[in-house]
Design a protein with these regions (language model features):
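Structured soluble/peripheral alpha/beta segments that form catalytic or ligand/cofactor-binding pockets
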Residues: 1-330
Length: 330
């Protein structure tokens, strides 16, 4: 399990490698997500690392989000595997990830966060590759506690490990993961879509979507990543994603809706691209989703699922003005 989540940062062309872990307590619906990202610019040996932690709940105070950043002057200082990472920054923040023991601390100017978690997974990771990058995912459970800005959550969290990487940051993107699709612990879905333009007709035609669906002991790889606008259109905005994914034998239709941001807890995370641009990622752990599985060429669904708590991250390319810090209004 350790060797599967290896660093994938391109050395010559530059790019990004994003490793994300999230979990939801099925009893209280409290959730956390922990993001670790490495960026490098073309033909530069230096790399920038970002560590972000968030706690959220479906009602009451929506969320806490903290971030720390540091720079590495050479690639040899980066870990070979995400699951064996050691992170230390001048601010005093640190992270230790080894032997499925995950612990760390973030210091910022106004607050701090600490966490101690133990991870376990009954299945091996699955990967999908395309010419400019790839996606890797693994259903995982965490047992432990997290504390941020005086807010504490603890228990057994059910979620996913996700890694995605590439040479060029997409203008539009959606990342979706459901650890218990339809409330069934034997069904998990992780999917990703990338758009070549802002929301609109051009973006809908120039999009590619991939995903991994586990149903019991059977795994479906929807790996037809090339733009498929002639077969089925996709829709992406700040809070919703609709797409059709294809494999050689099946297709998957999904509609993910994060709802009204005034009601559903959303977070806005100011992110950076390898090219030095700034963008806004919107994240919620409480999106609703409707999924249907078809045989290729058939209009009769083989199976159908609905879920009220899915992890959804969107990048809609509509953020002309962003604050200086990591947190923004979603």
């Amino acid at each position: 399990m350790k060797t599967a989540f290896r660093q994938q940062l391109p050395r010559l062309t530059g790019g990004y490698d994003h490793y994300l872990e999230f979990g939801v307590d099925t009893r209280t619906q409290q959730a956390f997500w922990l993001s670790r990202q490495v960026l490098s610019r073309p033909w530069h040996d230096a790399a920038q690392r970002r560590l972000t932690v968030s706690l959220c709940q479906p009602s009451g105070p929506s969320a806490v989000l903290l971030q720390d950043t540091d720079a590495r002057s050479a690639y040899p200082s980066l870990p070979m595997c995400w699951t064996e990472e050691q992170y230390n920054s001048p601010s005093g923040s640190f992270l230790s990830s080894e032997d499925d023991q995950l612990q760390g601390r973030i210091f910022t100017a106004s607050s701090m966060a600490t966490w101690r978690l133990r991870a376990s997974s009954p299945v091996e990771p699955e990967s999908i590759l395309w010419p400019s990058g790839g996606l890797r995912c693994q259903p995982t459970q965490w047992l432990g506690e997290l504390d941020a800005s005086g807010h504490s959550i603890s228990g057994l969290f059910v979620g996913t490990r996700i890694q995605f990487w590439g040479r060029i940051a997409p203008i539009g993107m959606a990342l979706l993961s459901v650890p218990r699709l339809g409330g069934d612990a034997q069904v998990q879905l992780t999917a990703m879509g990338q758009f070549a333009g802002r929301a609109g007709a051009l973006s809908e035609r120039l999009n590619g979507s991939v995903g991994v669906l586990r149903v019991g002991h059977e795994t479906y790889h929807f790996d037809r990543w090339w733009p498929a606008g002639a077969l089925a259109s996709a829709r992406l905005d700040a809070y919703r994603w609709m797409a059709t994914l294809f494999s050689a034998t099946h297709r998957l239709e999904l509609v993910a809706d994060g709802g009204n941001p005034r009601i559903t807890p959303w977070q806005g995370l100011v992110d950076h691209t390898p090219e030095g641009l700034r963008q806004l990622l919107r994240v919620t752990a409480y999106a609703t989703i409707h999924v249907r599985l078809f045989a290729r060429g058939s209009d009769a669904p083989l199976q159908e699922w609905r879920n009220e708590s899915a992890f959804l991250m969107t990048l809609a390319g509509d953020t002309p003005n962003l604050p200086l810090g990591p947190v923004a209004t979603p």
